[in-house]
Design a protein with these regions (language model features):
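Active-site beta-loop-alpha junctions enriched in small/polar residues
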Residues: 1, 29-31, 105-109, 171-175
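Alpha-helical packing segments of well-folded alpha/beta enzyme cores
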Residues: 8, 12, 85, 89, ...
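Conserved, mostly hydrophobic/aromatic
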Residues: 16, 100, 168, 211
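Carboxylate/His-rich catalytic cores and anion/metal-binding grooves
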Residues: 20-35, 102
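An active-site-proximal structural segment forming one wall of the substrate-binding cleft
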Residues: 21, 89-107, 138-167
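Aromatic- and acidic-residue-enriched carbohydrate-binding clefts of CAZyme catalytic domains
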Residues: 32-95, 110-147, 176-195, 201
Length: 217
């Protein structure tokens, strides 16, 4: 939700090393922002890494306004790590015996990804209005969704060392968007299932299978 600079992350790693903590979980994506360069999807960082600064006061997610275009002059708060910067963080952490664990939040908490790439949004969802009211879950029926996730995983594989864990989030997944989405309902019929939760299970299984297929034993 809030971007931490390279210097701040390194200072955290130094503190972790001092107290013999050996895993740094980086929450790189969430509704209010996407923080890692993905070369195949440049709008993730050109748009969804930046937002209009909020007025001082209590944090309110529904007031967040992400950049509506590249170089949006009003969206000046935020930032992201280039792939080279992330490699630098990983090397810095490794030299202090700390493992960096990247988290890419899916299928829920995906407002930032959906904001940049509308093909991830379910049919019938009034985005972005409903996206800030719990309908921030990517579509389970569109083929673009699985392709997107696989592409992101492919790039993570080039950044992180072999055998590095990848966290896929999968928390607080709202199924409401899937209920009236023609693509999700079509996928549900293919699975011969009635429960919307089956879509989430199927998605996670497909992603996990893909990640495992990349492991060379």
């Amino acid at each position: 939700r809030h971007f931490f600079t390279m210097a701040e992350v390194k200072r955290m790693i130094d503190t972790m090393s001092l107290f013999k903590l050996n895993r740094l979980h980086l929450h790189l994506t969430d509704g209010p922002g996407w923080r890692l360069e993905i070369k195949k999807y440049p709008l993730l960082t050109a748009m969804s890494a930046w937002r209009v600064p909020l007025a001082s006061g209590e944090w309110n997610w529904q007031e967040v306004k992400l950049a509506i275009q590249e170089n949006d002059p009003e969206a000046t708060y935020g930032g992201f790590y280039t792939q080279e910067q992330m490699k630098e963080i990983i090397a810095y952490a490794r030299s202090r015996r700390v493992t960096v664990v990247p988290e890419i939040e899916l299928p829920g908490h995906a407002y930032a990804a959906m904001h940049a790439y509308g093909e991830l949004v379910c049919d019938g969802v009034n985005f972005p209005v409903e996206g800030k009211k719990g309908r921030d879950t990517v579509c389970m029926g569109r083929p673009e969704t699985l392709r997107f996730v696989k592409d992101v995983v492919d790039e993570l594989k080039t950044i992180f060392p072999p055998g590095s864990p990848i966290h896929l989030g999968h928390d607080e997944v709202s199924t409401e968007s899937w209920r009236n989405c023609k693509y999700c309902q079509s996928r549900l019929k293919e699975l011969n299932e009635n429960s919307l939760k089956a879509l989430g299970r199927d998605f996670l299984q497909q992603v996990a299978s893909y990640v495992l297929s990349l492991i060379h034993i």
